[in-house]
Amino acid sequence: MTPDDLLEEFRAAGALLEGHFILSSGLHSAVFLQKMAIFSDPVRTARVCAGLASVIRDRYGAVDLVVSPAIGGIVPGYETARALGARAIFVERDPGGPFQLRRGFSIPAGSRAVMVEDIVTTGLSSRECLAALRDQPGEVVGAACLIDRSGGRADLGAPLVALATLDIPNYPADQLPPDLAAIPAVKPGSRATTPG
């Protein structure tokens, strides 16, 4: 699957939105990628995650385990793991707390794991997920996502490979361009923020 194929999947699912959006990072953007429109379709999800699995194999080789941040990363993590023939686990947190492995999940010694995200904007969730894995006996070889909307600038503290890399401008609330400021903001994402 090429980056253009992935974007066509988003368009066909009605998941590539234009307007004024407050992202889960708190930044504002004229473009929102409504990934749940993709993940609500099992066939489409399998297709895009098989594409990501191919990119992971090319970059990192064989992996035994896919680790994703809850909640948004669970579906793409699971489906990517399935395409890789790997196990899928996830990190989760108490509200306001750090991510941690629970439910008996671990990265055993001798295993190779990759952290899989859906969409990376600032890389905050990815960095927090990777931090939760630092003390595990197995090796975390890197990270992967369907779309890196930072244009490759997000620093995760680990290698990142994306099925598509886009350079979509994002703005702090006090630095909006006039055309974006003229449109009422909506918050379609998942992380609680205060509009501003």
Swiss-Prot record:
KW NADP (keyword) present: no
Alphabetical list of Pfam families matching this protein: Pribosyltran (PF00156)
Any one GO biological process: pyrimidine nucleobase biosynthetic process
Sites where the protein binds orotate: T121, R149
Listed cofactors: Mg(2+)
GO MF terms, alphabetically ordered: magnesium ion binding; orotate phosphoribosyltransferase activity
Pathway entry: Pyrimidine metabolism; UMP biosynthesis via de novo pathway; UMP from orotate: step 1/2
Superkingdom, natural source: Bacteria
Catalytic activity, reaction form: orotidine 5'-phosphate + diphosphate = orotate + 5-phospho-alpha-D-ribose 1-diphosphate
Residues binding 5-phospho-alpha-D-ribose 1-diphosphate: E117, D118, I119, V120, T121, T122, G123, L124, S125
Keyword set, alphabetical order: Glycosyltransferase, Magnesium, Pyrimidine biosynthesis, Transferase
Enzyme kind, highest EC tier: transferase
Enzyme Commission code(s) on record: 2.4.2.10
InterPro entries in UniProt: OPRT (IPR023031), Orotate_PRibTrfase_bac (IPR006273), PRibTrfase_dom (IPR000836), PRTase-like (IPR029057)
Similarity-based family: Belongs to the purine/pyrimidine phosphoribosyltransferase family. PyrE subfamily.
Assembly and binders: Homodimer.
Entries under PANTHER family matching the protein: OROTATE PHOSPHORIBOSYLTRANSFERASE, URIDINE 5'-MONOPHOSPHATE SYNTHASE
Record protein name field: Orotate phosphoribosyltransferase
Organism, scientific name: Methylobacterium sp. (strain 4-46)
Gene name, Swiss-Prot/TrEMBL: pyrE
